[in-house]
Design a protein with these regions (language model features):
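PAS-family sensory domains
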Residues: 32, 39-125, 129-135, 142-143, ...
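Short amphipathic recognition helices of helix-turn-helix/homeodomain-type DNA-binding modules
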Residues: 1-18
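Short, surface-exposed beta-edge/turn micro-motifs
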Residues: 33-34, 165
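Short amphipathic alpha-helical segments
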Residues: 17-29
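Low-complexity, glycine/alanine/valine/leucine- and proline-rich hydrophobic stretches
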Residues: 133-183
Length: 183
């Protein structure tokens, strides 16, 4: 009846997948010099390659903490490593809003938003009053654990459209220091 009255389907709930198909993990592992990770609709990082782990420390985080928004807004150690933190954080928040539109009533996403409002004054302020930003998914610059600045461009690949899984691959703006393995 609601479809007849409103002429639109109800908002969908996002299913927060926590694993990737084995071939996707293999693809990321093959990107030996490119940090890459897969995130679900809620921006939980659910898979990553070794170089992404070296850069972001995903394997050292509890599953609950392995969320890009939570890492950017509520992890002071990562915040210190992001030279353009304010710009990156606003960009990430704007892109999350786009994903939220896919499942605006999803309880897991709404809980994350409420948690971040408590954990971060910046998140709380920007959530109330969104700022227009340009399109760029991911973090532009980060200091590695030896304080060396790394600058990136990104590409987002849809891994599974129905499961809302996206792979973010980072590409160095300068020539990589490592060599490509022989095949």
């Amino acid at each position: 009846l609601f479809m007849l009255a409103h002429r639109r389907p109800p908002p969908t709930e996002g299913c927060q997948w926590l694993e990737v198909p084995p071939l996707i993990q293999t693809l990321m592992d093959d990107l030996e010099i490119r940090p890459a990770y897969v995130m679900n609709l809620r921006w939980d990082v659910i898979a990553w390659n070794q170089i992404a782990d070296k850069l972001f420390g995903f394997s050292h985080l509890d599953q609950h903490e392995r969320n890009i928004l939570r890492m950017v807004f509520a992890n002071p150690a990562l915040r210190k490593r992001l030279p353009a933190w304010q710009e990156d954080a606003q960009q990430i928040l704007a892109l999350f809003r786009c994903d939220l539109a896919t499942a605006p009533q999803d309880p897991a996403m709404l809980t994350l938003i409420e948690d971040l409002k408590v954990l971060s004054a910046d998140f709380r302020r920007w959530w109330k009053k969104p700022e227009p930003v340009s399109y760029r998914r991911g973090i532009a610059s980060i200091l590695d654990f030896e304080d060396k600045r790394l600058d990136f461009i990104h590409e987002t690949l849809i891994v599974d459209e129905h499961r809302h899984l996206k792979m973010i691959a980072y590409f160095a703006q300068k020539a990589p220091q490592m060599t490509t393995p022989e095949i």
